[in-house]
């Protein structure tokens, strides 16, 4: 009799423990499920009770908002002002612009739109356009004056010396750039550009005809110089002769003084 009562007591105790454990397990599952449904907002695939959304749907962007000392993830269809969208195969993100006073940016260090009242110049925001630039067409974007549009450098020309291509070893060669387009109303600001450098070539004798022409030209130049010297000397001698003649004439006209009296 006692043995039967003990068996019944053990069976009842085991049944009670089983029911209790099932109830606790069911309560835990319901609590986790409830917390998950409250933390994950629409468009969020993975979330945390502490940090909000951890992963958004493929077409949405995740933005980390600061809440006291925590960062909470939020899923958005587009990034707010001051952020730019960074698309990634894993997850699209909104990244804050690092440029001061920037409202929209292309990357973290290149602004595309400044806050109201500020001027945009080369991806930065300024209270006024920097020196050498001005706002274009009433906008808030600064631009530098139009530059001269030049052609590419031409190939280097032949090595020459005094317009000769022979009879020397060291000479010079040059190349040029031409104006393709000048700023409107300021054509004087642009001009063709020439660049010269020294060159060394193997000495090539000049053809006989060119030598004779060169020699004849040299003789003519020497003859002209000699003629000029001769004319200069003759002019100097003539000037001295004329001066001597004038002095003699002056001495001949001056005679002794005589006094006039009654005969």
UniProtKB/Swiss-Prot annotation:
The keyword Glycoprotein applies. InterPro entries: Furin_repeat (IPR006212), Growth_fac_rcpt_cys_sf (IPR009030), R-spondin (IPR051514), Rspo_Fu-CRD_dom (IPR043601), TSP1_rpt (IPR000884), TSP1_rpt_sf (IPR036383). It comes from the Eukaryota. Changing residue 87 to A: Nearly abolishes activation of Wnt signaling. Glycans are attached at residues 137, 153, 156. Abundantly expressed in adrenal glands, ovary, testis, thyroid and trachea but not in bone marrow, spinal cord, stomach, leukocytes colon, small intestine, prostate, thymus and spleen. Keywords: Disulfide bond, Glycoprotein, Heparin-binding, Nucleus, Palmoplantar keratoderma, Repeat, Secreted, Sensory transduction, Signal, Wnt signaling pathway. Residues 147-207 form the TSP type-1 domain. The keyword Signal applies. It is found in: Secreted; Nucleus. One of its GO terms (molecular function) is G protein-coupled receptor binding. Residues 206-263 are annotated as: Disordered. C-, and N-glycosylated. N-glycosylation at Asn-137, negatively influences its secretion and enhancing effect on Wnt/beta-catenin signaling. C-mannosylation at Trp-156 by DPY19L3 is required for its secretion and regulates the enhancing activity of Wnt signaling. Its main location: secreted. Residues 218-234 have a biased composition (Basic and acidic residues). Changing residue 110 to A: Nearly abolishes activation of Wnt signaling. The FU repeats are required for activation and stabilization of beta-catenin. Belongs to the R-spondin family. Upon injection into mice, it induces rapid onset of crypt cell proliferation involving beta-catenin stabilization. It also displays efficacy in a model of chemotherapy-induced intestinal mucositis suggesting possible therapeutic application in gastrointestinal diseases. Interacts with the extracellular domain of FZD8 and LRP6. It however does not form a ternary complex with FZD8 and LRP6. Interacts with WNT1. Binds heparin. Interacts with ZNRF3; promoting indirect interaction between ZNRF3 and LGR4 and membrane clearance of ZNRF3. Interacts with LGR4, LGR5 and LGR6. Identified in a complex composed of RNF43, LGR5 and RSPO1. Interacts (via FU repeats) with KREM1. This is R-spondin-1. It comes from Homo sapiens (Human).
């Amino acid at each position: 009799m006692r043995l039967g009562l003990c068996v019944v007591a053990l069976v009842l105790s085991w049944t009670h423990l089983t029911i209790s454990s099932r109830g606790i397990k069911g309560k835990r599952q319901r609590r986790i499920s409830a917390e998950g449904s409250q933390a994950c907002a629409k468009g969020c695939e993975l979330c945390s009770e502490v940090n909000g959304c951890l992963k958004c749907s493929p077409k949405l962007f995740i933005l980390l908002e600061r809440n006291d000392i925590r960062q909470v993830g939020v899923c958005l269809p587009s990034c707010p002002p001051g952020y730019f969208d960074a698309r990634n195969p894993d997850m699209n993100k909104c990244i804050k612009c690092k440029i001061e006073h920037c409202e929209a940016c292309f990357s973290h260090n290149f602004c595309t739109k400044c806050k109201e009242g500020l001027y945009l110049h080369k991806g930065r925001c300024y209270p006024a356009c920097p020196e050498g630039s001005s706002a274009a067409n009433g906008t808030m974007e600064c631009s530098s004056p139009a530059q001269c549009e030049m052609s590419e450098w031409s190939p280097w020309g032949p090595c020459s010396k005094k317009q000769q291509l022979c009879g020397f070893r060291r000479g010079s060669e040059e190349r040029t750039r031409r104006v393709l387009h000048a700023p409107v109303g300021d054509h004087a600001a642009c001009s063709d550009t020439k660049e010269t450098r020294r060159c060394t070539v193997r000495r090539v004798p000049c053809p006989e005809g060119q030598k004779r022409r060169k020699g004849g030209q040299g003789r003519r130049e020497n003859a002209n110089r000699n003629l000029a010297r001769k004319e200069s000397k003759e002019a100097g001698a003539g000037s001295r002769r004329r001066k001597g003649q004038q002095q003699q004439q002056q001495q001949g006209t001056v005679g002794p003084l005589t006094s006039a009296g009654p005969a």
